[in-house]
Swiss-Prot record:
Localization: Mitochondrion
Region (Type E(+) motif): 462-492
S-S bridge residues: none
Chief localization: mitochondrion
CC per GO annotation: mitochondrion
Gene assigned in the entry: OGR1
PROSITE patterns named in the record: PPR
Region Type E motif: start-end pairs: 386-461
Organism: Oryza sativa subsp. japonica
Name of the protein in question: Pentatricopeptide repeat-containing protein OGR1, mitochondrial
Superkingdom of origin organism: Eukaryota
Amino acid sequence: MSVSAAARHLESLLPRLASLRHYLQFHARLLTSGHLGAHPGLRARFLDRLALSPHPAALPHALLLLRSLPTPATNDLNAALRGLAASPHPARSLLLLAGRLLPALLPRPDALSLSFALKASARCSDAHTTVQLHALVLRLGVAADVRLLTTLLDSYAKCGDLASARKVFDEMTVRDVATWNSLLAGLAQGTEPNLALALFHRLANSFQELPSREEPNEVTIVAALSACAQIGLLKDGMYVHEFAKRFGLDRNVRVCNSLIDMYSKCGSLSRALDVFHSIKPEDQTLVSYNAAIQAHSMHGHGGDALRLFDEMPTRIEPDGVTYLAVLCGCNHSGLVDDGLRVFNSMRVAPNMKHYGTIVDLLGRAGRLTEAYDTVISMPFPADIVLWQTLLGAAKMHGVVELAELAANKLAELGSNVDGDYVLLSNVYASKARWMDVGRVRDTMRSNDVRKVPGFSYTEIDGVMHKFINGDKEHPRWQEIYRALEDIVSRISELGYEPETSNVLHDIGEEEKQYALCYHSEKLAIAFGLIATPPGETLRVIKNLRICGDCHVVAKLISKAYGRVIVIRDRARFHRFEDGQCSCRDYW
């Protein structure tokens, strides 16, 4: 057999290598036949397969082979780098690579080498290494490579350095769709969903910036929908949906799943379910069902969440996310027995979130002893969130002893957030124990803990309007305050009396009524009434849970003004219509 024929024969064997023994035998054959040095292309392809093999000993053997080569080629380095980037320990692998290969620059890395290294640094969120690799990109003169710069941008974004990611993007003279997608996803998944949407609109209006024949793809749409879902911008979400239709992406299952999530989080349950039912049954995935069940749950339709869970086809096995979504639905609807039944029948090991939902379910129902017993009998120690859940239940039912126990546990765990103090203070205030309230506030001051201010915002004609309690910063604040006076007058005719028990301060009754009147969600609703046509649905998002008085007021406004009002608070959705709320006053 000729040398070239032998090489071709060995090449044909590469796809058949299935075990570490096969790889070692192939390596030995390369050594004994002389092909290891004579055919660098074959060697690099072998290294690539070896480095990516799932066997735990394969990658170390690939690195050993690389270091044994007297004159390794760049392709050899890239094969090892690719394996390192995909390995379970990219940080350790990068350290090994930086210490033994890159400083000597033998072999000389190319754009592909740096791309694999950047993927590894992104996986381990190593911003420092990304900066060093960025310097190497400039030093080696490969800063014109669009794919490499896209990977650099992506690495910065995944390391949380969105400013550097944007700088790389802005300095690029040529951008392909992957470049736009990387920054879109980075902004949407990071802390800048508003910037992500602005970037999406820029892309939507600037197709000429993409190379010829390139179009937005499912990654583009999913990132934009994620941003809409986070902020609760229904109109923007609908625009993204229409945009997806232009490119035939609205039938893509991944896009559909994101649409379900977006519509449900923007308060349009009906649209979310329309998208779910538009997916062919055979194409519906676990993610599709999880998104639809979560949609029912967050809107307080626990019974519907249970029914959809029971209707899941046998080919789809529920996972932890599925069970959590169903349990949340039971929790928001007060379906205690159903929730316990689902929890006790779980086919996956429950985690802290599952236990936390059960504790909340029992706590809301007033079964505080069972809730406490669940906390102390779990197979792992309760975390801060679980004790906060129990503290919230104690506050809801005014049980001082349990509240103090939970607060002490939180202190032992090192929790020092405003919510812990506020809940305990509220329990004391509900019992008119003002000295204890003062003591809690003194502790907050001494620990430099500040209460997170409540705020609400609403979207009118594509513009977000934000309000805080007692806000007078809005340009139309005087109109808003006059509208509130009219609201109070009209709903008083329907029997409204301010629930001053929600004002947890030792002040007079008149002062309490004034404090209640100008809560941020009331300001947002009042603005919506004067800024939108009669009959239009009002949508409000609040960063904290809605208070009892605002809940009553929203119900009465929906009746007095003939409006549907949808409020998304920290925990769930409330849909107010004709004097009723979708939560059935269980929240």
